[in-house]
């Protein structure tokens, strides 16, 4: 048990260091990957926490991480859209969006949401150690394994549903994949599962981008020239996603 707790504490401290680095990069607007790296780090934290629900401090930390995720989602979406627009020659539309980013980066760095997350995260290793001392972590390893297996079962059921919802499938795939990365020694997935999950997530991500951009185009006039292409790309992505999901289901379940 002590080894597992040591690993948890080490991961939490590493994630805290990563977040502090991202915060400094955002505050100084050093590069355009800082926001993405911040979100990736928060995602890794949430994946680490999900199987630990019920332990002291976990709920508060999950809520704080979720708040940072909600704060930064529209900013990251704008980044991704601007990159697409630049790539396809719509430079003016891209620039209009990118001009907003530097100030947005600074606001995220100074936000109460990020400050609150860092405050709770700094104290969390002490919560884990105190829980261990009070014998609250008995059975932690099988509990984590049981919750990881339950996530895998949920994905299996969703894949077998003929009326599956792509949004929910995308979320379930991300949860399973990131949990496996957080607990590689505890998550007993089939040998080729990670590569299949990554491909499925990518295919659903392409579909989701088009779906989201088409929704934005309804009230952003400068996106209208892209609408026809997005409809075609979305239809193609749906077919690709279905094929990849069928392969995931056949190979891994």
Where would I find each of the regions flagged by the language model?
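Function-determining surface determinants
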Residues: 1-253
């Amino acid at each position: 048990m002590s080894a597992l707790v040591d690993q948890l504490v080490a991961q939490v401290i590493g994630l805290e260091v990563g977040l502090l680095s991202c915060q400094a990069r955002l505050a100084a607007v050093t590069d355009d990957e800082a926001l993405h790296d911040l979100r990736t780090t928060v995602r890794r934290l949430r994946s680490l926490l999900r199987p630990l629900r019920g332990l002291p401090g976990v709920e508060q930390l999950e809520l704080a991480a979720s708040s940072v995720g909600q704060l930064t989602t529209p900013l990251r979406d704008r980044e991704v859209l601007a990159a697409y627009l630049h790539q396809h020659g719509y430079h003016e539309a891209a620039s209009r969006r990118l001009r907003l980013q530097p100030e947005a980066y600074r606001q995220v760095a100074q936000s109460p949401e990020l400050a609150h997350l860092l405050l709770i995260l700094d104290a969390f290793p002490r919560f884990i150690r105190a829980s261990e001392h009070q014998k609250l972590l008995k059975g932690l390893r099988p509990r984590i394994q049981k919750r990881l297996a339950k996530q895998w079962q949920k994905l299996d059921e969703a894949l077998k549903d003929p009326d599956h919802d792509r949004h929910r499938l995308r979320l379930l795939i991300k949860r399973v994949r990131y949990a496996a990365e957080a607990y590689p020694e505890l998550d007993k997935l089939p040998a080729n599962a990670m590569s299949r999950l990554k491909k499925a997530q990518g295919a659903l991500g392409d579909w989701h981008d088009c779906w989201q951009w088409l929704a934005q185009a309804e009230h952003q006039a400068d996106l209208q020239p892209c609408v026809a292409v997005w409809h075609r790309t979305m239809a193609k992505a749906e077919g690709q996603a279905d094929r990849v999901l069928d392969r995931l289901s056949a190979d891994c379940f």
